[in-house]
Regions:
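Structured, hydrophobic secondary-structure cores that serve as assembly/anchoring elements
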Residues: 1-198
C-alpha cells in the first residue's frame, strides 16, 4: 500500500522550503516576500545610513575572500547584534572560506568536534543558503548578522491541501496553498560582504 497523500505532503514540504529560501533571500517583493539581498546596500555606517539600507563591507580582492575581510565584517556589526549572529553563504563560498587562515596559520573555520555542535567560522555559526551568490566581482556573497532580529518571517499556520477527485476523472488533483511573508525589520542587525570589483 502506497500512501499518496503522505508522499505529496513530504514533497510539498520540500518544495515550499526551497521556494521560501529563494523568496527570503532574493525575492523582489512582488507577490512574494522581499528577500534580504533585495534591499539596497551602501558602505555607510549605522550612524548615518538610512533605515532599510544594509551596510556592506567591500573585500580587498575581486576573486577571493580574505581572513581580514571576515574579521572586519564581524566587528562592523554592533556588539548587541553579535549575540546570536551567524554567517550565511552558499556551499561554494563555504568551501573557499574553509581554507582561510589567520596570521598564525590557524584555520578560521572550526569543525564541530562534539556530537550536535555545529561548525563555526571565527567563533560564529554558519547557515548554508544556496540562494546566496558565489564569490565573484561585485557579488554580495556573504551575510553576517543576527537574522532573527534583522529579518522577520511570518507564516500563516498550516498548509492547505484540497483533494479534488471530481474535476479530472479518473485522476485525483491536489491543490495546495501556503501563505508566508518576510521583511527587513532592523537594517543594523545584518551586514554584507561585497566582493571588490577589481
Amino acid at each position: 500500500f502506497f500512501n499518496v497523500e503522505a508522499w505529496i505532503n513530504s514533497e510539498l514540504a520540500t518544495e515550499f522550503a526551497e521556494q521560501e529560501e529563494i523568496a527570503f533571500t532574493t525575492g523582489d517583493g512582488t507577490k512574494k516576500p522581499k528577500g534580504s539581498l533585495a534591499y539596497e546596500s551602501t558602505d555607510e555606517t549605522d550612524k548615518v545610513r538610512a533605515f532599510g539600507k544594509l551596510q556592506h563591507i567591500v573585500s580587498g580582492d575581486a576573486t577571493a575572500v580574505t581572513a581580514d575581510a571576515i574579521i572586519k565584517l564581524i566587528y562592523t556589526l554592533r556588539k548587541a547584534h553579535r549575540t546570536g549572529a551567524k554567517f550565511m553563504m552558499n556551499n561554494n563560498s563555504l568551501f573557499a572560506i574553509r581554507l582561510l587562515k589567520d596570521s598564525e596559520g590557524n584555520y578560521l573555520w572550526l569543525p564541530g568536534l562534539e556530537l550536535g555542535q555545529p561548525s563555526s567560522l571565527a567563533g560564529y555559526g554558519i547557515a548554508e543558503n544556496e540562494q546566496m551568490p558565489d564569490i565573484a566581482a561585485d557579488a554580495k556573497a556573504i551575510a553576517f548578522g543576527n537574522f532573527k532580529r534583522g529579518y522577520t518571517i511570518v507564516d500563516r499556520i498550516g498548509t492547505r491541501i484540497l483533494r479534488d477527485p471530481y474535476t479530472n476523472k479518473p485522476f485525483v488533483g491536489f491543490y495546495t496553498t501556503k501563505r508566508t511573508g518576510g521583511m527587513l525589520v532592523d537594517s543594523q542587525a545584518i551586514k554584507l560582504l561585497k566582493i571588490a570589483v577589481a
